[in-house]
Amino acid sequence: MFIDVGAASLFFDVVGESLNASTPDMSQRPTMILLHGGPGYDHSTLRPYFDRYSDTHQLVYLDHRGCGRSTGEQKTWYLDRWADDLAEFCRTLGINFPVVFGQSFGGMVAMHYAARYPSEVSKLILSSTAAQFRLDDTVKMMRELGGDYAAEIAHQFFSNPSQEAYDAYGEICLPLYSNPNASDAGNFRNRAIERP
């Protein structure tokens, strides 16, 4: 589904019911909004891990502005705008006091949202994220994990993004984030809609 927010069309998917039909009073389930990593990926990377919680929460998967199926011009890709998108999204759909889960980049958006709108979030769950991005630390990590070539690609990707840099980062650097012995290492790229 799509919703227009701040000159962008945001894609979202809902799993689970808002009202619990198995209770006599049709009690309201908490809504959990799930924010994917990236930028450049979509919510499908989270679905295999979180759909199972639809028996206790209504799950709302959101593709950030400019990511996945969502639109939005690159000049509007910044944390204030992504946080404001989430606030407007919740207000428009009547989602009050959501539990907000943020993975990696989604965690940065979640923290920014909670800082800008502290009275509008009930809980914040953060996974594999940081309060701020440090290019030098990321380049150092890529050098340690993948050598000088991986460090060079990471620097190019984060300092001068292009389709070529995005493709190289996806091929060389992204696998370094995974356990190479895992049976599904790197398979998330097969399901995700990737956009630089």
Q: Across the structure, where does each feature detected by a protein language model lie?
A:
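Conserved acidic catalytic loop of the alpha/beta-hydrolase fold
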Residues: 80-98
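Short acidic-hydrophobic surface loop/beta-edge motif
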Residues: 1-5
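Catalytic nucleophile-loop/oxyanion-hole region of alpha/beta-hydrolase
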Residues: 71-83, 130
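Conserved HGGG/HGGXW glycine-rich cap/lid loop of the alpha/beta-hydrolase fold
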Residues: 6-75, 89
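Flexible "cap/lid" loop of the alpha/beta hydrolase fold
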Residues: 122-160
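Alpha/beta-hydrolase
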Residues: 156-196
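Conserved alpha/beta-hydrolase "nucleophile elbow" surrounding the catalytic nucleophile
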Residues: 98, 102-104
